[in-house]
From Swiss-Prot:
Zn(2+) binds at residues 80, 82, 97, 100. Belongs to the YabA family. GO terms for cellular component: nucleoid. The lineage of its organism: Bacteria, Bacillati, Bacillota, Bacilli, Lactobacillales. This is Replication initiation control protein YabA. NCBIfam families: PRK13169.1-1. Homotetramer. Interacts with both DnaA and DnaN, acting as a bridge between these two proteins. The keyword Cytoplasm applies. Keywords: Cytoplasm, DNA replication, DNA replication inhibitor, Metal-binding, Zinc. Binds 1 zinc ion per subunit. Its cofactor is Zn(2+). GO terms for biological process: DNA replication. Involved in control of chromosome replication initiation. Inhibits the cooperative binding of DnaA to the oriC region, thus negatively regulating initiation of chromosome replication. Inhibits the ability of DnaA-ATP to form a helix on DNA; does not disassemble preformed DnaA-DNA helices. Decreases the residence time of DnaA on the chromosome at its binding sites (oriC, replication forks and promoter-binding sites). Tethers DnaA to the replication machinery via the DNA polymerase beta sliding clamp subunit (dnaN). It is found in: Cytoplasm, Nucleoid.
Length: 107
């Protein structure tokens, strides 16, 4: 191999290395996003399990108002109680969900 061929091979190797580095960075970014989402979901899961434990300890509801109170507590904890989005976390706790409110305040 002459010097020119060695230089070209080294240049090609360098370009391939740069592309591989860019791919690794993209994978790292994606992994970070997945880990963050996983953490949020684990926290939600823990909160829901805690809530379920509280509900199971209280036993079956004796009055019709207790079910509504439980739904209201779940809603105030930041979760949807409407049939369309039940159990999903509300994006913004300050914003009200019209479907959930209709269910809560229905007579």
């Amino acid at each position: 191999m002459d010097k020119r061929e060695i230089f070209d091979a080294l240049d090609d190797f360098s370009q391939n290395l740069m592309l591989t580095l860019a791919e690794v960075e993209a994978i790292k970014k994606n992994l970070k996003s997945v880990i963050e989402e996983n953490t949020v979901l684990r926290l939600e899961n823990d909160k829901l399990r805690e809530r379920l434990g509280e509900v199971e300890k209280t036993g079956p509801s004796k009055g019709g108002g207790q079910g509504r109170e439980n739904l209201e507590r779940i809603y105030l904890d930041g979760f949807h109680i409407c049939t369309d989005f039940y159990g999903q976390r509300r994006d913004n706790d300050e914003e009200e969900c019209a479907f959930c409110n209709e269910l809560l305040f229905r007579e």
